[in-house]
Amino acid sequence: MGDVPQAWKTANVTAIHKKGLKSNPSNYRPISLTCILCKILEDIIRKHVLEHLIENQLLCHEQYGFVPKRSTTLQLLNVMEEWTRVIDNGGNIDVIYCDIMKAFDQVPKCRLLRKISSYGIKGNILKWIENFLTNRTQTVVVNGVKSSE
């Protein structure tokens, strides 16, 4: 455990038409297709890590999405309830929404791994995550023809 085959770290990226003119590139959404065996192992590791985070109460109360019984829909309902309570009590609400483009891609991998380690994820699981995140490649597939990596 700890090693990830290079073939598992290669994504085949293809474009799926969303809407509008097919001649307009912005009307396509990229989809990354990866090895099914890797996806299965990813899910096993995700469940193990999430279980560790929940058991050790390492997730903050505001964490929604990717957490059992804490969907982003529930988050929206909780926020709306809080805002309604504040407004009903004569208060004001100021909201700033931020969408950080490619946020995960901008996180330094060494910092992410240090944070994961500080949460008690160690040994082979941490090695696997580190290996999984390094030397990733992708090819673009158009009409069944692959680009070079």
Predicted regions: what they are:
Residues M1-E149:
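Conserved pre-catalytic core of RNA-dependent polymerases
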